[in-house]
Amino acid sequence: MGHPDAITLHFPEFVRVAGEVLQGHIDLDLGAAGEDKIDEVHIKLRGSIVTRITEYENKPGEGTQTHYKTETLVRVDQVLWDQKNAPPNLPQVIQCPFQLPLPTGLPPSFHFSHHNRAVTISYAIEVVGHRHGILHANRRVRKVFPVVPPGDLAATAALSQGWRGPWRPYRVQDKIRHGIFGDHSEATMEFVVPELPTFPMGVGFPFALHIWTKTKPVHQEDLESKHGKLFPAPPESASEVEVKLKRRGRLHVYFQSEDIDENIQLRGSLGDSAALANIRTTFDQPTFTPLPDGHNKGVWNRGVHFEGFLTLPEAPTYSTKTVEWHYILEVKMDFPGLGNILKFEVPIHINSGVACPPLPQAPYQYNVPYTYPLPGGPPPMMNLPPSYWSGEHHNWDEVNGE
């Protein structure tokens, strides 16, 4: 990227909020800069939406056609140092502070890539050491960072203090049977979450997952210990319940559009087989309900309950003319037999859950460790793929010769 000692960028690494002022500084080694023929140092703030859709022709041999679109979200340039206008007798290493304003209304950082389509909403600051001479490439030090819009603070506070509000249940019930013939059994699944219009990213919210089963009519003496597992048996572990977070949406490039549809791996609770210890599991005592005129027959009622917290550190739900996405939590229980599946989808709206920091009230102090200006600390880190941080699918300035 450049001379290893000429330019050092100091910019705290955490999620930024649209509307805040970014602060940091560079250390510029004047001796190393002179050896590297650097005569000016600029800093750039960039944000953009870059989309790509590739069309595959139906007829053999016609090839493909790829459509690209870049939408600029923020573009700020500042000169940090100019050799011509620099005062004399400077120390070997100087500090150049900077302040870069993020506009309000920015969409959150986002990255999605499939074999024929991709979209990236990215933000970065870049320090450019301009070198005189047509054969000397400019030196660049870049740092990619994530951005979120301000979110709902009330939900964050309510969840952080322990949810005491109303709950919203999602419930499905069906008749099932183990074989092709015979009486049906019954299974019920219910998922309960706080009744909130939106959930803050990175803040755990409580859930309860209940599964109840009723056997087909059997004799009361048909106990599990004597006749094996009566059908349907509730799951013994949360790992038997399939829970997925799905991101769905659509991206547009001029007159072309494609779907966004991907599964996101959940961590730390439901949907993560390595986190079963974080889920509280309780079983109901089996009860027998006699059937009226059932000739000593009835049904066995059993149930299991899973309780814990879910955290969704994903890019907040958002919609622009270029791209939109939303989330669905899919919960599925597959009992033995053909088609014995209970499933429902829970729409989940995610917001950042954080406020925009206030404007700086004092000059930047490069010799003092940075302290986040809000008591809650910086926003939680988002789940973004390595390709976001590496700059893949970003339309950086040097591609255009800047």
Language-model features and meaning:
Residues 1-402:
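C-terminal beta-sandwich interaction modules and adjacent acidic
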